[in-house]
Amino acid sequence: MVRESDLVLTMFLCAAVLATGLVLDAGQRRRFMNWFCLAVGLFYFCSGLLAIVVNLLDIYIYLPPEGVLFGLEVPESLHYLNVFNTNRTISSLWFYITLCMMVYQFFACKRRALRIPIVIAGLLFYLAIGMCFSRTVKIVTAGSVAMLAVLLAFRYLSFKRLWQKCLVVLICAALLIPLSFKSFDWLSSLMSQVSEVLISQVYGEQGDESVSGVDLTDSRDLKEDISNLSERGQIYASFIPTLKTDPKRILIGSFADKLMTVPNTFIVFPIPFTHMHNFLLEVFMLTGLPGFLLVAAFCLLLVLRMLHLFFTKDPRIGLAEKTLTIPLAGILLYGMFEVVIFTACGDRRAPTDMRELSFFIIAGIVLGYSHDILPKLPGLKRK
């Protein structure tokens, strides 16, 4: 799946962008994020708009100069967006990250008139997530909606007791996660009707009355896939047998092209898997226990800083800064079911991609803000 040289280059790139948020002051971070959101938002707005249009028209195109497939992809009877010839989980996470950036920019923007295009872009990214048909990212997005609701409740409502805050968190999770997840089904049904109207107008003028719209509904059995984690359970279960069969992986890991040779012998599936579908297990397989401990320590520190920033009452931290914890939480959750960070997750055209770089850019910003108001975490202070 990856090349060893890509892993090394990726870590240097990620370390560089992580340091960006740590070396800048608060004002510089804000300006940096404004330009970052603008660049990412414009690129993926154009990409998403083009992909949605060609999808609704049931067509596809090849983009120069490489002739990259762009538009409609129909595996397993699912019509989903194909953006730059990537799979649906990669494309949908792109749009998820840009959606989170629009949420941040909405609260960071002081000019109300500029919030209108931000909202339009955010709605398009939300729609694109639904049309990519990645249930992992749909669940992540639904959880992010609940996190945003919790932030808004803590900001505009007064809760003096801990049990009240816990109750708000539970209510937001219980109501908004299933409702947000269901909203993607409603969007798919709506877009199916829009597709039928568009196609009938385009082809009706040519005298072809037999055409119909694209069926964008998801017919997969959600309960069955949840019960077996879409076959991920077998992959996770192969971890310990793999280490017993090839114990040297515990200390030195394995070469990238040999990563799944042993695990696949314990998996019953028609197609061999190419990765562990969990970034922590993937890191362990690639680097062994030493690399795993380093990554686990970084993730633990990051999560603690995220929680601190999310719940802080420090007046120097506004709602916009707190929303930056949402995409980090979403990408970490996504990484429990896919590979996205620390693993050179880009395709053969590049050693990494926007998902991994964005994670470390945002992580650096969050660590910087948290360090400004609390240089040392309480549990890490020296006695």
State each model region's role.
Residues 1-13, 22-32, 48-64, 82, ...:
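Interfacial transmembrane-helix termini
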Residues 68-85, 268-282:
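Juxtamembrane membrane-water interface segments that cap and precede transmembrane helices
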Residues 145-146, 324-383:
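Transmembrane alpha-helices of multi-pass inner-membrane enzymes
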Residues 152-223, 241-245:
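A membrane-periplasm/extracellular boundary helix in multi-pass inner-membrane enzymes
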Residues 223-287:
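Long extracytoplasmic/lumenal interhelical loops at the membrane interface
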